[in-house]
Regions:
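The conserved acidic donor/metal-binding loop of glycosyltransferases
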Residues: 63-67, 92
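Acidic helix N-cap motif at the loop->helix transition within catalytic regions
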Residues: 20-28, 67, 71
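Conserved nucleotide-sugar donor-binding catalytic segment
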Residues: 52, 69, 109-200, 211
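A conserved acidic beta->alpha catalytic loop
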Residues: 15-24, 41, 63
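Short, acidic, metal-binding catalytic loop of nucleotide-sugar glycosyltransferases
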Residues: 1-8
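Glycine-rich, basic loop-to-helix element that forms the pyrophosphate-binding segment
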Residues: 38-54, 75
Length: 214
């Protein structure tokens, strides 16, 4: 993050009860852009606190074990300023693991997601740790992360789309997404699957209601 070509940003780091040397390492940096917040095991609340504490017009999301392309913030900010209607800008990513395996992720669509609610019924095309979000839209529509374990991002995109937000996927690999045996997509696979089913039911009911009210 500190190697970004775009340098004018604040760096909020929310430590969610780490047990390694994370805090010690962060405190070793003297960069004034860094702000460390320590909250133990309050994941959803921590996500929302990050949204509230961020003072900028745009919020870029990132997970601790992934790697950000040095041009990511510059490219996303340029895209969103050039197209001010965009609410959420995700990117393509490259998946890697500690075993050295690597593959591209380019099946997440690209450009503006037309009929976003209908598309979200099919799958979640926005990679959470790759996003940049327009904060003003969230404030104006009172949108925040909800308690949807393992699919809180999926729910957020749905709420944004319902409010008329524009979802966009930048067709560049601006994130290195780490795959490991300890991440949520592996350790809570069943919970994530059930959460996705729950949310798809909610989306389907919304679409049926909208259709019946025409």
């Amino acid at each position: 993050v500190l190697n970004q070509t775009l340098t004018d940003f604040e760096f909020l780091i929310i430590d969610d009860g780490s047990t390694d040397r994370t805090v010690e390492i962060i405190q070793g940096y003297t960069d004034k852009r860094i702000r460390l917040i320590r909250k133990e095991h309050q994941f959803i609340q921590n996500l929302n606190e990050g949204l509230e504490l961020a003072s900028g017009s745009y919020i870029a999301r990132m997970d601790a074990d992934d790697i950000m392309h040095t041009e990511r913030l510059r490219i996303q900010l340029k895209r969103m300023k050039k197209n001010p209607d965009i609410t959420v800008c995700g990117t393509w990513a490259k998946i890697f693991s500690d075993k050295g395996n690597e593959r591209n992720v380019s099946h997440l669509g690209y450009g503006i997601i037309h009929e976003p609610i209908l598309e979200l019924l099919k799958y979640n095309m926005i990679l959470h740790p790759s996003v940049m979000i327009k904060k003003e839209f969230l404030l104006n529509h009172h949108i925040k992360y909800q308690n949807y374990p393992c699919v809180e991002d999926y729910k957020l995109w749905f709420d944004i789309a319902k409010a008329g937000g524009i979802l966009f996927v930048e067709p560049q690999e601006l994130l290195m997404f780490r795959r490991s045996d300890t991440q949520v997509t592996v350790t809570k696979k069943e919970e994530m699957s059930l959460g996705s089913i729950r949310l798809r039911k909610e989306i389907l009911l919304y679409l049926l209601s909208a259709y019946n009210n025409k």
